[in-house]
Structure formats: C-alpha cells, structure tokens
Amino acid sequence: MDHSVLNVLVCPICKANLYYDKENQVLVCKADKLAYPIRENIPVMLVEEAKKMTLEEVKKYG
C-alpha cells in the first residue's frame, strides 16, 4: 500500500484518520470501529464493505 495514499484517506463516515493494518490488509477507523478492506492494493472505502469491529479489536490499535 502506497503511504502517500494513506496520508489523504480518511473515514468516509466521520473523516477521522485511518490506521493501516498491513498484516490484515485493512484500514481501521477507531472512532467508528470499522475496518475497510484493501484488495489488490486498493482500499475499498465503501461503508457496506467495512467490517464492524468489537471494542477489544479496536483497542489493539492504541
């Protein structure tokens, strides 16, 4: 994933910065507890494609 892209992407719901989880290939919005998938190096920033995360899952991102 190109880090210059990460600098401009924000959560489509709340506009918060996203955390890049390289291992799981997702972009995480801690505020909305959503994980947006990255497929073939392309972030899928559609709310309907995002996975809802538990509070415990979100906590591991700090």
UniProtKB/Swiss-Prot annotation:
Gene3D superfamilies: 2.20.25.10. HAMAP family: UPF0434 (MF_01187). Pfam families: Trm112p (PF03966). Belongs to the UPF0434 family. InterPro entries: Trm112-like (IPR005651). This is UPF0434 protein FTL_1400. One of its GO terms (cellular component) is cytosol.
